[in-house]
């Protein structure tokens, strides 16, 4: 037994004995910490008897390989792995802890901020492998915010009063291409709104509702750096960051301006494709409207040539302007200015014809007097509609005419008038029509 051999040596030979033991080669794959308790106690007793006053020399780097070493050292724990995210996606200690926040090693674990942000942000995919912050960290999320995202707490209020809209706020996706930045920044702005930071987002005039705090600026910088890697940023974003790498607010302001410009472009295209003109508005106003739209689109990189513009304009013409589609649609070299010359000519002709017409109205009393003084020179023909009517049904004018003619001079006309109405009446007209009572 080696332990008995160690007890027989003198104190002076303890060093050589230890050297012989440590220099002995042990061909084994046994864990250096897997040593039985009995062997460990025997070694400790032998070492104490051999040298009770001399301190034990620390083991060398080769000692953990010896299973008989008396004082095992704790094994070093390897640093935790960072999951599927590469090392370059992590922020440094100085970047992640600028204002006293605890260091976080995983990009999905956004720091629990003083203004009650969500304690954990989950990236897309399985979430069971990612640890969560304990429930004791920070203040519990007790008072939810409005769902609208447009009403935000004032920065002058206490930090504890600012709570997150949801317990877990969905983070924006990772930016993977410079072409996807316009769509990505929309989701990032929505992420800030859900995190009670809508008040720091620039408005239409380029100014935020309230002043951003230092902690909020740090959070803005950290989240932008995590979810928008620098290699996928557009050139204009890199130019801003090259001047000031923390000026995320300027990037958001420029992005909002570009969104408004894109919206204006879409509206201009829709307006140009749905033009309508019939002369109800001045031709000058119509021309100004169309030319301004074409100029804005050309300035924004959407070029509208004369052929396309003329086709869109002529398609919306109606009324007297409609014939312009057929008179000049074959002219390939026609410009917008030439088309508007024709439109102006038709409009001026319409205005001239309207001005030449009398614009006065006759007095109603004059019309009444004219109707009274009007005399009918033609003698209307009398046609019996009902043969069963008696002579009393004749008009007063006919009876007066019969009386006057019978008193003055008798003639054959009187006999024709006194004839029965049941006889057919012959009309003196060119068609020689006859009306019979039984056929009427």
From Swiss-Prot:
Miscellaneous comment text of the record: Retrotransposons are mobile genetic entities that are able to replicate via an RNA intermediate and a reverse transcription step. In contrast to retroviruses, retrotransposons are non-infectious, lack an envelope and remain intracellular. Ty1 retrotransposons belong to the copia elements (pseudoviridae).
Biased composition (Low complexity): 153-165, 402-418
Compositional bias of kind Polar residues: 1-23, 48-60, 127-152, 419-428
Protein name per the record: Transposon TyH3 Gag polyprotein
InterPro entries, per the entry: TYA
The keyword RNA-binding is assigned to this record: yes
UniProt-annotated location(s): Cytoplasm
Residue numbers carrying Phosphoserine: 416
One GO BP annotation of this record: viral translational frameshifting
Domain statement: The C-terminal RNA-binding region of CA is sufficient for all its nucleocapsid-like chaperone activities.
Residue(s) at site: Cleavage: 401-402
Complex formation: Homotrimer.
Secretion signal, residue range per the UniProt entry: none
Chief localisation class: cytoplasm
Record region (Disordered): 1-93, 126-173, 352-440
Function: Capsid protein (CA) is the structural component of the virus-like particle (VLP), forming the shell that encapsulates the retrotransposons dimeric RNA genome. The particles are assembled from trimer-clustered units and there are holes in the capsid shells that allow for the diffusion of macromolecules. CA also has nucleocapsid-like chaperone activity, promoting primer tRNA(i)-Met annealing to the multipartite primer-binding site (PBS), dimerization of Ty1 RNA and initiation of reverse transcription.
Basic and acidic residues bias locations: 429-440
Residue numbers spanned by region RNA-binding: 299-401
Molecular function via GO: RNA binding
Organism of this sequence: Saccharomyces cerevisiae
GO cellular component: cytoplasm
Keywords: Cytoplasm, Phosphoprotein, RNA-binding, Transposable element
